[in-house]
Structure formats: C-alpha cells, structure tokens
C-alpha cells in the first residue's frame, strides 16, 4: 500500500488560543503549517467569537458560556465556562469544581464537534493538546492522533491521583455519602482519560527533558512513543526592536497606582514579568523581590521600574499584595498583545519568571529572541533553555544566584534569590551579549524549523504506522 503524507492537519485544544502558553504555541505552529502549504483546522474551546484568527486557518468552536458581561450567547453552547487545570483570564471553571453531569455534557459536545469535522473535512491527523479528556476522545476515531504534553496535564493527572487517594481514605473511614462517590467517579474518570490518551496516541511530544522523565514515570506503558519536540516561537512576531523606537510603547500602557494612570518615565532600569496570574507562575515572588531590589537599587541612586504584564484569577490578591508591600515603582499594566510584549522585551533590562516547575515556558524563548536576559528557576524545563549543555553552575558568592549561558537560574520559592539575581543582571548587563542570546534562540527555537524538520516528518510517520495497522 502506498503511504499517504499529511495534507490536512487538525489541531485540537480544549482551551482558547489566547491567554495561555499552549494557545500561543498552537498559533505559532498553525502559522508555519499554512506557510508550508498544509490545510489547517483548529478546534478550540471558547466562550466568545471575538478572538484573533490566523489567515488561512479554519477555526471550529467548541462553545461554552462565559461568566463576565457582556456574555456572548453562542449557538449550542454548554451552560458553563470552558474548564481549566489552573486559571484563565476568561474562566474560573476548573476540573476540581466541575460536576459529573457537566463532564458528561462536556464529552458529548466535544464528540459532536469532532464527528462534524471528520464528516466535513476528514483530516489526515489530529494533533491533540494535553494528555487529557479531549485527546482521549480523539483516539476513538480512525484517524491517527499525536499528543503534545504541556505540563499542566501531568499536574492534573497527579492531582487526580492524590485526590482519589484522599477520597478512598474518606470512604475507608465510613464517609459514604453520594457526594464522596461522585468525586471518586470524577477523579477515576480523569485518570482513565489521561491513560487512554497516552496509550492510544501514536506519538507523544514532550517539550523538555524534565517533562520526558515525568511522563515516563506516570505512563510507563507509553514510554516508547515519547519524542522531545521543543516549543518554538514565531520569529515574525518575536524579534528585537530598536529600543529607542520601542520606548513609545510605554505611553500606551496604564498604571494601576499612579494618579493620572500614566507610567513614569524617570526610571533607570526596567524589569518585567509576562504571564497569566496562576499560582505556579509565582507573581507573588516578583512583588516580594521588587520590594527588596527597589530599596537596594534606590540606595545606590538607581530607580528600577517593574511592570507586571498579564491577568488572571489571582489579580485582586496580587494587587492587594502590591499595596501591602507599599511598592513605589511596580505597576500592573494588564494583559497585552504580542506586539506590545515584543516592544517591552526589547526595552527591558531583565525578565523575571520564577515559576514553580515550569514545564518549558515559551516566554523565556520570546525573551531571548528579543535580546533580553531571563531569570528563571532551576527546575522543570527552564534549565534546558537557559543552561542547555547542563554545565555545573557556580553561585555568585554569598547568594543562590546561578549565572548560566543564556540567563540566570535561582531556587524555587526564594524572593531573596530573585532579588539578588535581578540586581546581578541590572548591575552587570554587559555580561550577556544581546546578539548571542538572540542567535541562540533563533537557532534552537524557530518554530518554522521545528515544524518543517521535526513535526511534519513525525506526522507522516504516525500516518504510515496507522496504515500498516489496518
């Protein structure tokens, strides 16, 4: 039988294509597939139709109902919001809170959309995002599925396993009410769905060595399917702008603490955070570190301005922390589009991202492509990006700061180390050559190269393997 190469690619995500790293990655990948001449569809969950769309890509909506006014009433929408592992700007619904009846409706709606797409377009391959429910459902059809692991799905599986152990303990102690058994059924379903997705996918894409180890630990039966496929960035969007030209972007942003709502311009150094306000992103550490480095740099005659770029469920809590810390030069400026983020990365002196166990982090790569210096935690997939050769790093005397080739690493949950690392970069900015940072990121994290040389051949291999099985 002659083998068939991929022509029609259907990317499936149970989340919106904006507001989280997985959506950014999907968008970058889809753009490259279109440029390479493929027919591309994105099936995406959302509670509205007002979102950015790529030319040449067909978008199929899995409709949900939003929480915030104005609510767009979508035809056939589920009567609840799209469901997240952590949080999203436009949804507070998560897999811990959802009820069994909602889960049944959730699965039915996804299957309805999948079957419509198969009937009308018959894709050659499904590219499922997250080893979770929607991907498990995809594997029920006679079309090969490859799955990208994003990290939150592995966290979700571990959470389900832990919650199930707690529930079984409650039952053993005699708590036999219906609510306990409903929760038990829910977490059993989550674990079974993740295992089904792992077992039935033709390929499993992981985005870091740490994630590869974790996936194989949780799903040893699917270890032979795992392929390391780095997250890439769209170099048409992320590149270094001339700082003098890019500075005007500050005039377009609003501060949450100044009387006139404008950002001050009399700063000497600029630090930024970019990301969603989820617990593991540790925006709280950025604020606590800012309290330290604002004061110490001020004593040295330097004013550091810090911009917090993003939004999410923890926004009110974080702004309350900002107020309690009496931060003078730290400003929340809201979620911003990619072109604004590019300009801010281009004019910034340091990028702060102290996440707990960040699976990979596109933002580090976007930062490097713009010639900025990232500070990240020595955990998860971050060392793969900032210290790719796995060198033995020596801390700066009297600190826990580990300068690496392409940024600075610190321990998790340590605001003093984050403050020390920030000041190290601000006071020694010339140690990191901007061109070296950009060249490294362009060589290793160009999404077009990754798509053309790695992903498309793996799609074709998955299709060929499926044909051999028939």
Where are these regions (language model features)?
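Nucleotide-activated donor-binding/catalytic signature segment of Leloir-type glycosyltransferases, i.e.
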Residues: 297, 303, 316-336
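Carbohydrate-associated surface elements
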Residues: 210, 232
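Aromatic "clamp/platform" in nucleotide-sugar-dependent glycosyltransferases that forms part
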Residues: 356
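Conserved donor-binding/catalytic core segment of Leloir-type glycosyltransferases
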Residues: 205, 254-281, 287-290
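Short alpha-helical donor nucleotide-sugar binding micro-motif in glycosyltransferases
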Residues: 335-336, 343-348, 455
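A conserved catalytic-core segment of Leloir-type glycosyltransferases
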Residues: 42-113
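Membrane-proximal helix-turn-helix segments that form the acceptor-binding/catalytic region
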Residues: 169-204
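Short hydrophobic beta-strand element within catalytic cores of glycosyltransferases
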Residues: 373-376, 383-387, 392-394, 399
